[in-house]
């Protein structure tokens, strides 16, 4: 691999595979672990998720600034060590307080990686088509995620703490390996003359804000990201409940309801890997793809599949549209990231990508309670329909982004 491709590209693919494997292994049975080992009640479970999302939201911008001021490579390494520390803390110390603290630690680690990784590979591989790089990275992440789900499930049947601890250990090991092999040759700090961390942070924040305001395409793409965040939380939180409450899950041999969800996850990942490969093959044949068409069609397809999933009552029909909805998101995200990359100043890449991640988290924080309230007061299907409606503004924003020029 290292002989055929550049070192940075190979390291990027290795990172996406191993990191996804470790995180999937650690989290695949996290709710079961929290219920059976830590013995959390319903309120505590919700609080764990809230602390995690809030940590990601609060740390996203500061860590992006660190990556653009000091080093994207260093930011990724810090993130991996925080990932490992957070998972080890959660798995080794099964108490509510340490689980909450672990969410803060690995949530902070996630923000050190988000934005910095994309900015690092975009700078190191300026001559490669970034759409293909992001799609191939997404594909490797999905393959690692599938393996992580399988390993996590097998290990969890032995001991529920084991996959969390081993996943954390793998994150630490990956951090050590990256410290030896991860290059950084094209980085230049966003601010050459330093005035102290706080002043540098404020200065870069103002530069970033001014740049985004003066870039209409980027501003529109960030608004599309916010819409995606608004429409993701309801789908992620309510889809399982919709399967359990509004249809009959067939029992086929060993496939009970619990096993079915693992199988569905694996099928979804497999479809994502295949779709990414087909899109990469099309890019290699034609040289490029229309980002406007891809983002528009996948957004519209996601809305349609979500509505059909909400009104469905047949298990097989619901399974089909559920998988298609997930596929739409899998295809859209790397293409949207590549589109955004083309309108970002090189020195502020990590900060802008972190802003995108922050808007996605903000959308989830806002959209989740709205959809949850509708599901609680009316019904789960109506909550899912509400989720679809929250993405509708994106259908008007995508053509606008396609026509504008920075």
Task: Show the residue positions of the predicted features.
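Primarily marks hydrophobic transmembrane alpha-helices of the MFS/SLC 12-helix fold
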Residues: 76, 292-295
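Helix-loop boundary and gating motifs at the non-cytosolic
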Residues: 2-57, 217-265
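Conserved MFS/SLC helix-loop-helix module at the cytosolic interface between two early adjacent transmembrane helices
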Residues: 56-94
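C-terminal ends and interior cores of transmembrane alpha-helices
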Residues: 81-95, 300-313
